[in-house]
């Protein structure tokens, strides 16, 4: 485990620029500071789509560690971003010290970015601060999702972390339309009404497309988990937010992945 007080702090950075050139989306600039890096571009679709894996080689973040990810998707480019693994947040090495992650993503006119959902696993005594900012053009296509777990449940760690503080901001045509903060502290009894209402897993998705409507979402989610709770909000024209509460990690993960696949197919193939 990297939580030893003798280990150096890691400050990973990943800067990626994608552009459409000669009819193909290309990764035209990449700056990587370990432990963050990116895979080579993969192409598995008939449509123009550049797929990359976002890699974190240290196995997790420790208090005092920081991660900064900045991704630019230029006009007409199409990108799929797949985290290689869950974000594991190790225990704080000293009181009041947190690990941090900052994400910035810009999706320009007619461009598309699909960020596949992955889990955040806060270990016992972990403190995690996350800030995520998206800049979208009204003609762009975008998907982002994640799942917060109660901890390492197979090690009998449920809600033993110090805090998870996550802020999402979304700008649509340079106007701030979303400022959404989720700040969870287990000492505040997360499973009471107004927190997690007795559930252990929390999932969230943000998605945008020019012709996206609530009716599309209702069709994709008509067979939602019987024992889960979910709701959606049409935040702005073409921008929808979905939240889940679940007692099953595999069921919530399946729901997130099913929605991701449905939206991706809709956006790329019009199906």
From Swiss-Prot:
What is the protein's given name? Answer: Urease accessory protein UreD
At the top level, the lineage of the source is: Bacteria
Q: Where in the cell is it found?
A: Cytoplasm
Look up keyword rRNA processing and say if it applies.
no
The text of the family note is: Belongs to the UreD family.
**PANTHER family the UniProt entry points to:** UREASE ACCESSORY PROTEIN D
Primary site of residence: cytoplasm
| GO molecular function term, any single one | nickel cation binding
Q: What does this protein do?
A: Required for maturation of urease via the functional incorporation of the urease nickel metallocenter.
